[in-house]
């Protein structure tokens, strides 16, 4: 089996719309198996006024959100990039998914801000580690706008490639990958000082 297909990646942000979905797209196009989630209580997107965001339950299809924003103001939401974002999202999967309701297991989870990292780690701890399967949770602090989502997504792909290469190397040499991950993260962080990184091993 292709090593890229053997590893299972996951990307997580608050609403499963911008940062996690751009990273989802980039990893998927690179040939990786990837899923994505949000950790917020609901999907929140900018509204026509600052104090009135658009709020949707997780599971609301991206296409429905797209059409709702289109009916509110095509001009406004095209200008701020939301319609283009949702168009990308609906090509990747049906709807935003909530991390806490997910049942899949992953080898690596990339979160896009510290509160999402904390939510994922807390949820995994609450699940109790019954499978005794390690999962590497890595936070990369990405600002929540279109341009930074693209920069962060490319940086996550670079890290995924480094991790993939090392996992393959460790399997061939019969060495323990867990002994190598901090060195990989340190090397990656040196190349991306503008994207602060956190790491925590956890268990399913």
Curated annotation (Swiss-Prot):
EC annotation from Swiss-Prot or TrEMBL: 3.1.3.16
A GO molecular function held by the record: protein tyrosine phosphatase activity
Annotated Pfam families: Ssu72 (PF04722)
Signal peptide as annotated in the record: none
UniProt keyword list: Hydrolase, mRNA processing, Nucleus, Protein phosphatase
Compartment(s) where it occurs, according to its Swiss-Prot or TrEMBL record: Nucleus
Recorded catalytic activity of this chain's protein: O-phospho-L-seryl-[protein] + H2O = L-seryl-[protein] + phosphate; O-phospho-L-threonyl-[protein] + H2O = L-threonyl-[protein] + phosphate
Keyword Nucleus attributed: yes
Subunit field text: Component of the cleavage and polyadenylation factor (CPF) complex.
Family: Belongs to the SSU72 phosphatase family.
UniProt function note: Component of the cleavage and polyadenylation factor (CPF) complex, which plays a key role in polyadenylation-dependent pre-mRNA 3'-end formation and cooperates with cleavage factors including the CFIA complex and NAB4/CFIB. SSU72 is required for 3'-end formation of snoRNAs.
Name the record gives this protein: RNA polymerase II subunit A C-terminal domain phosphatase SSU72
């Amino acid at each position: 089996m292709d090593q890229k297909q053997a590893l299972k990646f996951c990307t997580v942000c608050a609403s499963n719309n911008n940062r996690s979905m751009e990273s989802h797209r980039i990893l998927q196009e690179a040939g990786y198996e990837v899923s994505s989630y949000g950790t917020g209580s609901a999907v929140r997107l900018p509204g026509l006024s600052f104090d009135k965001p658009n709020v949707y339950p997780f599971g609301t299809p991206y296409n429905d959100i797209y059409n709702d924003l289109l009916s509110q103001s095509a001009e406004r939401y095209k200008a701020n990039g939301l319609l283009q974002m949702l168009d990308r999202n609906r090509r990747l999967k049906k709807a935003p998914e909530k991390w806490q309701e997910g049942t899949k297991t992953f080898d690596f989870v990339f979160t896009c801000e510290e509160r999402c990292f904390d939510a994922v780690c807390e949820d995994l701890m609450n699940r109790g580690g019954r499978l005794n399967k390690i999962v590497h949770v890595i936070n990369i602090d990405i600002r929540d706008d279109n341009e930074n989502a693209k920069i962060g997504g490319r940086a996550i792909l670079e890290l995924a490639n480094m991790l993939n290469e090392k996992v393959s190397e460790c399997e061939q040499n019969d060495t323990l990958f867990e002994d190598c991950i901090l060195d990989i993260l340190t090397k990656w962080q040196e190349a991306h000082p503008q994207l602060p990184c956190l790491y925590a091993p956890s268990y399913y």
